[in-house]
Regions:
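Catalytic core of soluble alpha/beta enzymes
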Residues: 53-170
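Catalytic domains of carbohydrate-active enzymes, especially glycoside hydrolases
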Residues: 42-54
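Active-site beta->alpha loop and helix N-cap motifs at the rims of alpha/beta catalytic domains
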Residues: 28-37, 42, 59, 63
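Short, conserved phosphate-binding/catalytic loop or strand-edge motifs used
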Residues: 17-22
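Metal-cofactor-binding active-site regions of metalloenzymes
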Residues: 25
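Metal- or metallocofactor-binding catalytic centers and their adjacent structured scaffolds
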Residues: 1-6
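Residues that scaffold the ATP/ADP-binding catalytic core of kinase and kinase-like folds
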Residues: 14
């Protein structure tokens, strides 16, 4: 930040960033499908094009919830799902493939399996049409490297607070 102040540049420019606009999402929390559909309509009315939907609390209901969200969102909105480590690898693949078959248009799934289960994450990544985002699995640069080397995820979410700040994130 001091260099940014010295050179009168935002920190993102100092690190080579060129985007003027970023995509953000709004979280649709787990609830009854009807409530989630209403929350989705409210988010769309507020201008959100990307929705992050919490799933995993009751996998049997996840398809119904996501169907309701997709119907409320329409075909042009992006839907990301966050399972918060709730599924086992086989369950994740089964559910994600069912979502694909139903045409729910899921952009990505965040942390479908427990954080420490890198092999399970890889299992899902190799067998699902839905791209997998590692989140809770990444606590350090070594974790990120291991996940990339293993091919355990398609994407990595780096949280600055979790990994020790901007320097470690880079």
């Amino acid at each position: 930040d001091l260099y940014g102040q010295l050179y009168k540049l935002p920190v993102c420019k100092l690190f080579g960033g060129s985007k003027k606009k970023i995509v953000t999402d709004i979280t649709i929390s787990v609830n009854d499908p009807e409530v989630m559909a209403e929350d989705t309509k409210n988010a769309v009315d507020r201008g959100y094009d990307t929705l992050k939907v919490k799933v995993g609390v009751n996998p049997d209901l996840d398809l119904a919830r996501l169907s309701a969200v997709r119907e409320a969102a329409g075909p042009d909105r992006r839907i990301r799902i966050d399972a918060n480590q709730a599924w086992n690898p086989k369950q994740a693949v089964r559910l994600l493939n069912q979502m694909q078959e139903k045409g729910l248009g899921i952009e990505l799934v965040e942390q479908p399996v427990p954080a420490h289960d890198f092999e399970g994450l890889k299992f899902v990544t190799e067998r699902s049409y839905v791209p997998v985002l590692a989140d809770e699995s990444v606590f350090s640069p070594a974790d990120a490297v291991k996940i990339m080397q293993m091919g355990a995820a398609d994407l990595i979410n780096i949280k600055l607070m979790k990994c020790g700040g901007l320097y470690n994130a880079l």
